[in-house]
From Swiss-Prot:
It comes from Gallus gallus. Residues 444-1019 are annotated as: Interaction with HDAC1. Keywords: Chromatin regulator, Nucleus, Repeat, Repressor, Transcription, Transcription regulation, WD repeat. The gene is HIRA. Belongs to the WD repeat HIR1 family. Cooperates with ASF1A to promote replication-independent chromatin assembly. May regulate the transcription of a variety of genes controlling cell growth. This is Protein HIRA. The lineage of its organism: Eukaryota, Metazoa, Chordata, Craniata, Vertebrata.
């Protein structure tokens, strides 16, 4: 045995709490305390193994240093394939690192000495769930799961294939959880905590298998960590700090019956870390000895607070070697090399030690094939030797579930083969990939960057060059470092992690190109421009009328209604979602130009440029301040004005100037004083909205059909003493026109109908081809706002009453419903009006609330509240897999577009108990389903229903899941008195159930899957 303490491996005198050797043996990582943050350092293994490499100045010792953790790093662990490095620290975070293929070294940021990062490692995922310090992390044998434990008494199982998805949160410990280890077979995971217990959990259903407490009854919480370990053959689990007759031991727990009859004794203080050698050994055969095969055995290293290290062989009753006073402080972590002959040990004193054994001392290691045969003969097929495509966390009990998984695997294989073919085709055209980036050589890129630097001359003739930051170039791949003197086994390749995107709406000016910001939790945001489609809306799309306020004193105040839709923010933080926008820039002529000129001076009007823009249903960021009222306080109803333009003959310009027009609304009388209000309630006055001022002529662009224009010309001619007004419609080059006997105040249209509101409270309705559908409708009060969607007409009168009709069916949907109910506060305004394609009116208020009117119940229902704590605290990201991230642009998405990221932000900023987060998430998802049902948005209903079901499965809410399945299945046998409806908004419930069943069968609810699958087969 050789012992080495490389002094160059240090954290500048600060403690080192963790060490781990890379699976290929070329490097190792340390984690601990930095100067003012946590520190993760990746070191070269070659100078540790060979003295000549240590003396060679051309071989770097430090490869990379990462100071991203805000507090001390307690654990670092490499994934079994060597692609990822996970680190957990006191900042409650787990960071997952991956090597980046940047060209050239870089200096360590903030370093006083000129430290150089030879390799570049970037954080690809930040895992947030723990509410306390993260003490330990561990990768599963097949790298599909990552487990973390914390002082918050929980163990979190992360889906390593789809970070940051949480598969399970293991609760049961009543003390700080300080250690984790996976069963090498993949059936169990064990955790040890300060509550004097060691718990073993099943990976099949993430439930508790057993809790062992007797060996720990005399233990106290005196150790910083409790790093337990499982033997590579799976037979034994060895704990950290245990007691036997008041003496510190490492308890040996047998897998068969979880018996605790043996332990490792001899240390004078508490055992902090136990680490099994990854190899299984057999006795080395000497020359001339019997060829009889020996019984395999394992090797284990034990570290203690007494600063000593002991190495044990399970075939011996006494330790193979004991090294006393190896460090000045407690041993914190141990890591074996993959060949099983080397061991790295770190201490709280900030140093590490390396022990190099020979095969004569430990024995002959078994090959991986022999090791796998032991696993298969003892336990069946081991998860450690299964590929990800073969990975199955549960035993498949149903052949239908097996067929479904096989179909999924086949589809994934086909997609993979297609991508490989595309990549190979591209590779043939670019043989020099390593030296080319985006079609340019790296040398050309560097030269072009240097040309951009700014050089000036001072008065005395000296040159002054402004520094230019040149970002490092990522070639997309990296080769083996030249200084690695150890052969690397295999190619360490991994797919780039999908970035989690948060979408944020930018400026909403009609002439500015809109963009969505996409950001990763651990990266700076990047912009991605989105082009609108020509489609008016998707299946359940809406036409939106944004509302602004101003006094109607000027004759130039013309009510207009351009329709814009704000894209919904991403449901799942991982993907950029693009929303279909309805283009609807209305154009209206204005006979008085003074208002426009005044607005120009205030920089409130900008020219529309011929660019692709993403329009929004929300208000513009720049608004005209309402004129100060001369009487009682006013309640303002913000209405989206339709844009104004000078009348010109022929087809109007598309690059019209948008003019927001403000309208005042008479508010109820001022409230009585608090003294009088105690006994007298002042009667509320009726709301009063302004009437559109008649204009000589104006032009509108129909929001749902950008190729459709309405031209109005009032009092164009006089016939028989009466003045006639003309309505002209132009759609894709086809025109029709008609005349009316009254002046037209406002107009609206859709793909099916055209509607105009005239003086004398008359409403006229025409077909899309100009045929009058109804005699003039006489309204109770004058019109204030008019809107059309499909065959539906919505009117808002000056008395603040709302009405909706279906022209084709000639039925009333909403009859003179007052807005008094939802305009609760004196400062509340209506910021947006929506009319869905199902005739559901929606009012978005300035206080962040949105209401829709339910014709069946004749009630206003709250469908969205931007201040709702449920929306801010719900966290359902783990329930949405990456391949199912979908675009949702229905009415609910439009209403909630501004706040879709609030829950994600709150989850990062504020910690809460997991049980409370479960309850808030369930309540939020159920509210979303109910709101989508109220808005008759079928695709949004299906979207949220799938998310809800997946969340129930992930969290194990069987009773709610069963209730959901029962409602979708309905009665198995026909009953004449049954009230069950087989469809919901045109969606067949049993078809929805078929979509949910594969999600249910992926977890511990296979029997529930079988139960409902059989009933569906019968039906």
């Amino acid at each position: 045995m050789k012992l080495l303490k490389p002094t160059w491996v240090n954290h500048n005198g600060k403690p080192i709490f963790s060490v781990d050797i890379h699976p290929d043996g070329t490097k190792f990582a340390t984690g601990g305390q930095g100067q003012d943050s946590g520190k993760v350092v990746i070191w070269n293994m070659a100078p540790v193994l060979k003295e000549e490499d240590e003396k060679n100045e051309n071989i770097p010792k430090m490869l990379c240093q990462m100071d991203n953790h805000l507090a001390c790093v307690n654990c670092v662990r490499w994934s079994n394939n060597g692609v990822y490095l996970a680190s957990g620290g006191d900042d409650k975070l787990i960071m997952v690192w991956k090597r980046a293929a940047y060209i050239g070294p870089s200096t360590v940021f903030g370093s006083s000495s000129k430290l150089t990062n030879v390799e570049q490692w970037r954080c690809v995922s930040i895992l947030r769930s723990h509410s306390g310090d993260v003490m330990d992390v561990a990768w599963s044998p097949h790298d599909a799961w990552l487990a973390s434990c914390s002082v918050d008494n929980t163990v979190v199982i992360w889906n390593a294939v789809k970070f940051p998805e949480i598969l399970a949160t293991l609760k049961g410990h009543s003390g700080l959880v300080k250690g984790l280890t996976w069963d090498p077979v993949g059936k169990y995971i064990a955790s040890q905590a300060d509550d004097r217990s060691l718990k073993v959990w099943r990976t099949m259903d993430w439930q508790l298998e057993t809790s062992i407490t007797k060996p720990f009854d005399e233990c106290g919480g005196t150790t910083h960590v409790l790093r337990l370990s499982w033997s590579p053959d799976g037979h034994y689990l060895v704990s950290a700090h245990a007691m036997n007759n008041s003496g510190p031991t490492a308890q040996i727990i047998e897998r068969d019956g979880w018996k605790t009859n043996m332990d490792f004794v001899g240390h004078r203080k508490a055992v902090t870390v136990v680490k099994f050698n990854p190899k299984i050994f057999k006795k080395k055969q000497k020359n001339g000895s019997s060829t009889k095969s020996s019984c395999p055995y394992c090797c284990c290293a034990v570290g203690s607070k007494d600063r000593s290290l002991s190495v044990w062989l399970t075939c011996l009753k006494r330790p193979l070697v004991v090294i006393h006073e190896l460090f000045d402080k407690s041993i914190m972590d141990i890591s074996w090399t993959l060949n099983g002959l080397g061991i790295l040990v770190c201490s709280m004193d900030g140093s590490v030690a390396f022990l190099d054994f020979s095969q004569d001392e430990l024995g002959d290691p078994l090959s991986e094939e022999e090791k796998s045969n032991i696993h298969q003969s003892t336990y069946g097929k081991s998860l450690a030797i299964m590929t990800e495509a073969q990975l199955s966390t549960t035993i498949i009990e149903n052949p239908e579930m097996l067929k479904y998984q096989q179909r999924q695997q086949q589809q994934q294989a086909e997609q993979k083969n297609a991508s490989i073919r595309e990549a190979s085709g591209a590779a043939t055209t670019a043989p020099k990939v390593a030296s080319m980036v985006n079609g340019e050589s790296l040398e050309d890129i560097r030269k072009n960057l240097l040309k951009k630097q700014v050089e000036t001359r001072t008065a005395d003739g000296r040159r002054r060059i402004t520094p230019l930051c040149i970002a490092q170039l990522d070639t997309g791949d990296f080769s083996t470092a030249f200084f690695n003197s150890i052969p690397i086994s295999g190619t360490l390749a991994g797919s780039i992690m999908s970035s989690q995107n948060n979408q944020q709406l930018m400026s909403l000016d009609s002439n500015a190109a809109n963009s969505l910001n996409t950001s990763k939790p651990s990266a700076e945001p990047t912009a991605a421009s989105i082009k609108p489609t020509d489609d008016a809306a998707s299946k359940d799309g809406v036409n939106a009328t944004s509302v602004s306020t101003a006094p109607p004193a000027s004759s130039s105040s013309v009510l207009t209604t351009p329709s814009k839709i704000e894209p919904m923010k991403a449901f799942d933080s991982r993907f950029t979602e693009r929303s279909k926008a309805t283009s609807g820039t209305a154009v209206v002529t204005n006979t008085n130009q003074t208002v426009v000129d005044r607005l120009k001076d205030q920089n409130l009007i900008k020219d529309n440029k011929p660019k692709d823009i993403l329009e929004s249903s929300s208000d513009s960021e720049e608004k005209i301040p309402a004129a100060k009222p001369l009487s009682a306080p006013k309640r303002k109803l913000e209405l989206e004005g339709e844009t104004v333009e000078k009348k010109k003959k022929g087809r109007p310009r598309k690059d019209s100037r948008l003019v927001p027009v403000t309208l005042t609304v008479q508010s109820p009388a001022a409230l009585a004083s608090e003294k009088d209000a105690a006994c007298i309630s002042a009667p509320a006055l009726a709301l009063k909205l302004p009437t559109p001022i008649p204009q000589k002529s104006f032009t509108l662009q129909v929001s749902s059909d950008p190729s459709m224009y309405l031209e109005v010309e009032n009092e164009m001619t006089t016939v028989g003493g009466s003045k006639l007004s003309r309505l002209k419609c132009n759609r894709e080059g086809k025109e029709w026109e008609t005349v009316l006997t009254s002046r037209i105040l406002t107009a609206a249209g859709s793909c099916e109908i055209v509607c105009v509101a005239c003086e004398k409270r008359m409403l006229s309705v025409f077909s899309a081809c100009g045929r009058r559908l109804l005699p003039p409708i006489i309204l109770n009060t004058p019109i204030s706002t008019l809107h059309c969607t499909g065959s539906y007409i919505m009117t808002l009168t000056t008395a603040a009453t709302l009405s909706v009709w279906d022209v084709h069916k000639q039925t009333v949907i909403v009859r003179d419903e007052s807005l008094q109910t939802i305009l609760s506060g004196s400062d509340t305004t209506v910021s947006q009006i929506l009319l869905t394609q199902h005739g559901i009116p929606v009012m978005s208020m300035s206080d962040g609330k949105a209401y829709c009117f339910n014709p069946s119940l004749s009630t206003w229902n709250l469908v969205s509240d931007k201040q709702d704590s449920l929306a801010q605290c719900a966290d359902f990201r783990s329930s949405l897999p990456s391949q199912e991230a979908m675009l949702c642009s229905g009415p609910l998405a439009v209403i909630q577009g501004r706040t879709s990221n609030s829950g994600r932000q709150a989850a990062r900023l504020f910690s809460m108990p997991h049980l409370v987060q479960q309850e808030t998430t369930l309540a939020y998802l159920e509210n979303q389903i109910a709101a989508a049902l109220m808005l008759q948005s079928s695709h949004e209903y299906r979207h949220w229903l799938l998310i809800y079901a997946r969340y129930l499965v992930n969290e194990g809410f069987e009773y709610r899941l069963r209730e959901l399945c029962k409602d979708l299945l309905g009665p198995v046998h026909y009953s004449r008195g049954s009230q069950w409806e087989s469809t919901v908004m045109g969606l067949r419930k049993r078809e929805l159930l078929k979509e949910l069943l594969p999600v249910i069968g992926q977890n511990l609810f296979q029997r529930l899957f079988t139960e409902y699958q059989e009933q569906l087969d019968i039906l």
